[in-house]
């Protein structure tokens, strides 16, 4: 029975891995965006973490996960002589890589961490049925990589500590690599392994060789990571230059995050946010069951004494010191806590668990900013389909320039636009984020040309004659359907505003959770607007009355 359940959950994980939801900008801009430009020559816009004077992100742990698959994909296409892989193929290839890493490494680690066979099956199924495993863990997050590194770090700590007669040299080397990769991936990594790592002290005391190997290889991998990062950020630097004047990204990251003024730019939260808000959001009914187990028993429950629980709770406590606290920072806690907690057979819990994860799975795995990636992939085709001449020929087609305004969405990844080698097209993407509607309208007023300039109208209009063949400048607006401010430009009375929006494309599976204005509209009206008007639209902006 458990095998059939696990296989079914595996198919569910595949479905969500290939669903283009968008959980946080970091999943694109701190990984794929970086390497797509260098490996596949796609347009890319690097975030400040990689462009500041003191960069805080390392490429050392990212290269094998993102650059290597992209490089292999490019090599495969070159060998077949079929050009460059499309952004869509590259995007879903990376999702497939993350799925495989989750399926193989995460599930394997859980199997290793749970000692009793009957508990292993329940733990693996429980972790596999979590919406966090379906969504966050199959997306290109550094937090997802951190989960794999933390779980395997605990596996190796257990293996090394359990060896009484041998030095476990190979395990120490691998643990050194995992430790260095974890620290260079995210500076939060040591918080999860610091307390469990104390188990190694007796072994290191009995077997000094293990300690020597761990430290020596740790230094080697650290130097390697520093050299790779330094030469990435300063390509002209030699190995000696990198050693003399190194760029140590984890140190830069730590110095940045210890300043409250820097964290305030990203949002400050109360110190109890992780324990009282983020963990319940990630664990749902399992969190309630864990609290009840503490309440109902006078002694400390056995699950609370496990290595997984110690790692998760000590890590959460250490991360709670910092005032910037997002749920994704606790992704490693989910498999750790679910694998150590022993649930009694309860129909109420099973029903609540299924409802919670199905609801959050579809919300976060399908609808959450779900239109950004498909629309960005479709933008070149949308523009080309609406600018070709009536004979649909690419010959003598003037070069097209398009300004695309993204409003009330997450930042669109530039690399998903691809090379546009099949159509003479220049795309200027502008991220307006969540600016007020009046400011967005002012931006449109400045960009949309008057009727006399013969711009902003697609070439397929029946009135587009030979004298208007030079219409090559277009302004598009991409915004959620729930943005009611745009209704004044899309209705029949749009002419009174001087601008009108003509719908060109719509992607229905999109919900903007950052547009919940409960204070102004009220709860029910807000939910009706955001969930009732699902979808992400692409509009052509032009002057009203232009034919």
Curated annotation (Swiss-Prot):
A cellular-component GO term for this protein: endoplasmic reticulum membrane
Glycoprotein keyword on record: yes
Sorted UniProt keywords: Endoplasmic reticulum, Glycoprotein, Glycosyltransferase, GPI-anchor biosynthesis, Membrane, Transferase, Transmembrane, Transmembrane helix
Membrane topology per record: Multi-pass membrane protein
Enzyme Commission number, as recorded: 2.4.1.-
Principal location class: endoplasmic reticulum
A Pfam family: Glyco_transf_22
Pathway recorded for this protein: Glycolipid biosynthesis; glycosylphosphatidylinositol-anchor biosynthesis
Segments traversing the membrane: 5-25, 58-78, 96-116, 175-195, 208-228, 348-368
A biological-process GO annotation: GPI anchor biosynthetic process
InterPro entries reported for this sequence: GPI_mannosylTrfase (IPR005599)
One GO molecular-function entry: alpha-1,2-mannosyltransferase activity
Subcellular location: Endoplasmic reticulum membrane
Glycosylation sites: 391, 419
Highest rank taxon of the organism: Eukaryota
Family of the protein in this entry: Belongs to the glycosyltransferase 22 family. PIGZ subfamily.
Function: Alpha-1,2-mannosyltransferase involved in glycosylphosphatidylinositol-anchor biosynthesis. Transfers a fourth mannose to trimannosyl-GPIs during GPI precursor assembly. The presence of a fourth mannose in GPI is essential in fungi.
Name under which the protein is recorded: GPI mannosyltransferase 4
Encoding gene, per UniProt annotation: smp3
């Amino acid at each position: 029975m458990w095998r059939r359940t696990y296989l079914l959950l595996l198919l569910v994980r595949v479905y969500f891995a290939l669903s283009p939801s968008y959980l946080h900008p970091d999943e694109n801009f701190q990984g794929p965006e970086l390497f797509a430009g260098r490996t596949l020559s796609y347009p890319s816009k690097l975030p400040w973490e990689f462009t500041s004077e003191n960069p805080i992100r390392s490429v050392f742990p990212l290269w094998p996960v993102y650059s290597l698959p992209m490089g292999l994909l490019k090599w495969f296409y070159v060998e077949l002589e079929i050009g460059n892989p499309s952004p869509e193929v590259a995007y879903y290839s990376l999702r497939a890589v993350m799925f495989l890493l989750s399926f193989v490494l995460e599930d394997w680690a859980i199997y290793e961490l749970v000692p009793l066979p009957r508990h292993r099956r329940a733990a693996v199924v429980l972790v596999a049925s979590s919406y966090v495993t379906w969504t966050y863990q199959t997306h290109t997050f550094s937090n997802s990589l951190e989960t794999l590194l933390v779980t395997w770090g605990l596996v190796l700590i257990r293996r090394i500590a359990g060896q009484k007669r041998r030095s476990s040299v190979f395990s120490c080397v691998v643990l050194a690599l995992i430790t260095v990769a974890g620290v260079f991936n995210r500076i939060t990594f040591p918080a999860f392994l610091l307390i469990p790592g104390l188990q190694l002290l007796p072994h290191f005391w009995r077997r000094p060789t293990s300690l020597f190997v761990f430290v020596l290889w740790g230094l080697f991998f650290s130097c390697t990571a520093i050299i790779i990062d330094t030469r990435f950020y300063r390509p002209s630097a030699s190995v000696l230059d990198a050693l003399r004047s190194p760029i140590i990204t984890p140190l830069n990251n730590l110095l940045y995050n210890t300043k409250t003024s820097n964290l305030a730019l990203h949002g400050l939260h109360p110190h109890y946010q992780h324990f009282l808000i983020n963990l319940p959001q990630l664990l749902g009914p399992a969190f309630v069951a864990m609290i009840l187990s503490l309440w109902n028993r006078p002694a400390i429950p056995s699950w609370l004494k496990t290595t997984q629980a110690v790692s998760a709770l000590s890590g959460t406590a250490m991360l709670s010191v910092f005032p910037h606290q997002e749920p994704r920072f606790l992704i490693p806690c989910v498999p750790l806590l679910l694998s150590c907690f022993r649930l009694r057979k309860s129909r109420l819990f099973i029903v609540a668990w299924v409802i919670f994860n199905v609801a959050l799975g579809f919300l976060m795995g399908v609808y959450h900013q779900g239109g950004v990636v498909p629309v960005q992939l479709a933008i070149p085709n949308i523009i080309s389909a609406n600018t070709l001449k009536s004979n649909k020929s690419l010959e003598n087609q003037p070069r097209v320039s398009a300004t695309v305004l993204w409003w009330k969405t997450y930042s669109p990844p530039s690399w998903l636009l691809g090379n546009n080698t099949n159509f003479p097209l220049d795309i200027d993407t502008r991220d307006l984020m969540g600016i007020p509607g009046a400011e967005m309208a002012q931006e449109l007023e400045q960009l949309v040309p008057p009727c006399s300039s013969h711009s902003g109208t697609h070439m397929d209009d029946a009135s587009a004659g030979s004298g208007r063949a030079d219409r090559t400048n277009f302004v598009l607006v991409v915004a959620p359907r729930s943005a009611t401010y745009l209704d004044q430009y899309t209705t029949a009375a749009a002419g009174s505003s001087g601008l009108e929006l003509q719908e060109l494309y719509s992607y229905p599976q999109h919900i903007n959770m950052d547009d919940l204005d409960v204070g102004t509209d009220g709860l029910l009206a807000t939910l009706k607007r955001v969930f009732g008007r699902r979808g992400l639209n692409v509009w052509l902006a032009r002057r009203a009355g232009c034919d």
